[in-house]
Amino acid sequence: AVLARSRPDGIVVCNGYKDREFIRLALIGKQIGHRVYIVVEKLSELDLVIEESKALGVAPLLGVRVRLASIGAGKWQNTGGDKSKFGLSAAEVLRVIERLRAEKLLESLAMMHFHMGSQIANIQHIQSGMREGARYYAELRKLGAKIAVINVGGGLGVDYEGTRSRSFCSMNYSVAEYANNIVRALWEICHERNLPHPDIVSESGRALTAHHAVLITNVLDVERAPAVESPSAPAADEPQIIQDLWAGLQSLAARPPLEVYHDAAHWLHEAQTMFNHGVLTLKERARAEDIYFSTCRAVRARLQPGTRVHRETLDELNEKLADKVFCNYSLFQSMPDHWAIDQVFPILPLSRLNEEPTRRAVLQDITCDSDGRVDLYVDGEGVETSLPLHAPKQGEPYLLGIFMVGAYQEILGDMHNLFGDTDSVHV
């Protein structure tokens, strides 16, 4: 399929695992006029390439993948560096050069490939990897290999968070800065060693595909957070722990809100322990929880998002007081990376955009798996554990958009809970 759809002026790069049939097909592609590079990533592949090229009478177009010591930090750091699944060490690269020289095929080696990692967040890691890759290029040219193409592999990040930071779901550089660093590293080595300037190709799959898809889902049900806006004052004969919780709520106007919240959390824990030991009845425990959640709402109203010491508690209360919103999709099918590695995706309401959201929510899918829940949400300053949404209106549909799911999500998603495929619309 790749050969059939390849443009005459395009290139096809064959990397990854290769068996004899794969290599034969790649050589046939070269024979019929395509620029098909077979990238040698294991020494055993070189034997197969030489055997099949002789059998078909086709001079191969070869590349070699070098394994860099430089790696980019993050969830995918071991896709590059010494622990990479693919690539040749320095000693193995020398063995490839000598074998090709002995077979009079050194002229066929035209591409050098390396992979710095995936979703590299810090531009300094790209700079380090490119310096090492540029040195490899100079050394291969010195050994007589006519390398004309440098394949810098993947690594170009996607800023899922919008924070322009070194967080693993972000990137602290632009696409232009990435390109400038790639070109600069190779230009410098070419200028220093008086080498020809190679063509540069990349395999920036995530950066090319992440933005191409959005998942749209409708809200099916909402489980409201515990809400007793104005609990009544406790009677004189109610347990002391309830009296303490009530006194804390009443003191909020005169005390720091964080202090009141910490006391309320302590007293609630004490009340739950007393219930476990039979000291409190179920009705008394429920009463304690009502006063506690009322305290939480009152404290949240007094916290300032711009005050640093309030941020952690504010995020905690937003999650604690969030509604559970059940959406018509499967997390495991449509957002598997969120479940597996805490990948963050931007999520926004698509309905009632002319209204300010007044509730906080945690999204749940409709599988029977308790892990079917979105735990991390992009906001204006990073990542939070709840999402601002509108209060539901009876009988009115409410849609949510989950953005930037175009890279790997659909292909990785499974048939968990026997959910069928999501309907697709191509625009």
What are these regions (language model features)?
Residues 1-151, 156-161, 172-177, 185, ...:
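Active-site-proximal beta-alpha core segment in soluble small-molecule metabolic enzymes
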Residues 10, 33, 70, 77-80, ...:
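Generic preference for well-ordered secondary structure
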Residues 17-19, 43-45, 67-69, 91-93, ...:
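Short, glycine-/Ser/Thr-/acidic-enriched flexible segments
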Residues 31-33, 56-60, 81-85, 130-133, ...:
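Short, low-complexity, polar/charged sequence segments that are solvent-exposed and flexible
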Residues 76, 124, 145, 162-164, ...:
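Short linear functional motifs in flexible/disordered or boundary regions
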Residues 120-128, 159-177, 207-222, 414:
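Short glycine/threonine-rich loop-to-helix capping motif typified by GTGT followed
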Residues 181-183, 187-427:
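Charged (often Lys/Glu-rich) extended helix/loop segments that serve as interaction or gating elements
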